[in-house]
Amino acid sequence: MGFSNSDWGGAEGYKSFLESIIYYHGTIGWRSHKQKVVALSSVEAEYNALLESAQDLEWMKNLIFEATNKKVQQLLFTDNQSAISIASNHIYHHGTRHINFCLHFIRDLIEQQNLKIQYLDTNKMIADSLTKNNPYSKSIKHLRIIFSNQDL
């Protein structure tokens, strides 16, 4: 299970998108860094974060398969419905022409039923704690969820 998020300009001094990715339930991993590409929109930035998350989850899926011989579908949460729509919709739209076709790796994973992407309300997005200046109480709540493996 993974959580993917991005933020533009939320951190002092950054003028490019930050992304954060959290994986939990068993293996815990996270990272927060500036994106390697210049996104032309917030949707593209969210989609880039989804791409990196999907690649990591695919690696984890293969590791689980090698260790247990069980195939599992990975679940990835994002708080951007437009990014979900782009990932799930094969129809070309003029408004998304700037999104690089190599990013459609996510579509292939969805089509092969190796990945499911679900919307998660921004207030429940635990990856926000890595990209945004949240109130202390919200950050503590997110950390408790991450480290206790409790459900959202």
Where are these regions (language model features)?
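A residue-level detector for conformationally permissive "hinge/kink" positions
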Residues: 1-2, 105
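RNase H-like nuclease fold core
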Residues: 2-43
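RNase H-like nuclease module associated with reverse transcription
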Residues: 33-152
